[in-house]
Amino acid sequence: MKLVMVSGRSGSGKSVALRVLEDLGYYCVDNLPLPLMDTLLEQLKDSTELVAISVDVRNMHETELDKQLSNLPEGTELLSFFLNSSDEVLLKRYSETRRLHPLSRSKTSLKEAIDHERILLEPVSKLVDHYIDTSNLNIYDLSNQVREILLGSVDKELVINFESFGFKHGMPAEADFMFDVRFLPNPHWEPELRPMTGLDEPVQLFLSQQPTVNKFIWQIENLLETWLPHLERNNRSYLTIAIGCTGGQHRSVYVTEQLAKLFSQSKHTVQARHRELSND
């Protein structure tokens, strides 16, 4: 089992690091009390090989942490991070978000809470494998640093999901891009094609011979190829492109299949789903 532990000062980006780990397939637990670590690992040992936890100052003590890490189950590979930021940056972040610092009390100012946490966590910062100062990093920079440490590369695999649907059954709420193909020639009006779907060869042949269909597929491909690099740089994990026709049987299915084939030739992981066909 591989265990990644994320610790550090409140407001330094622990939740961002944990989201990166979740995107990489880790089972993540936020703010885990250290006494529960053994129980968690025991429960997960047969179901997952990748586990990530974050701990904050409220449930972390130097001696307790050292003891827990030295008594991990046999075969556990540990990688640890400590995230830090300057006092000035943390003050600014908390002032902007108006969140309550974990060590804030009724008579404790934000500055005093930040100072106190720095002192408490200084010994812990010396126990970890990777120390990251996030003072001058945005969330994308931090995500890339964590990913590079874990994978040796900042390249992120974007999963592209092409989904066909019928407008008469409602639009998919999860779509990032949506294209309406109801203006394209409709196989429904060809009696021999009506009972078929866009997965059947006669329908595919009919639509492949329509210049407007081919041009529209080319234009969608060109649009997506232009903007995919920008989406990847913003650390997108999934992209759903919905293609809709009237009933979700012919045109949208065909266009979805063609786009999925085109993008399967690239570095991306591509999925094709036909909502109305799967509901039959």
UniProtKB/Swiss-Prot annotation:
- Give the molecular function GO annotations: ATP binding; GTP binding
Nucleotide-binding as UniProt keyword? yes
The highest taxon in the source lineage is Bacteria
Entries under Pfam families matching the protein: PapZ_C, RapZ-like_N
Q: Which UniProt keywords apply?
A: ATP-binding, GTP-binding, Nucleotide-binding
**Where does this protein hold ATP?**
G8, R9, S10, G11, S12, G13, K14, S15
**What InterPro entries would the database entry show?**
P-loop_NTPase, RapZ-like, RapZ-like_N, RapZ_C
Q: Which residues bind GTP?
A: D56, V57, R58, N59
* Record carries keyword Cell membrane: no
The similarity comment for this entry is: Belongs to the RapZ-like family.
Q: What does this protein do?
A: Displays ATPase and GTPase activities.
Q: What is this protein called?
A: Nucleotide-binding protein Swoo_4243
Q: Which organism is it from?
A: Shewanella woodyi (strain ATCC 51908 / MS32)
Q: What is the lineage of its organism?
A: Bacteria, Pseudomonadati, Pseudomonadota, Gammaproteobacteria, Alteromonadales
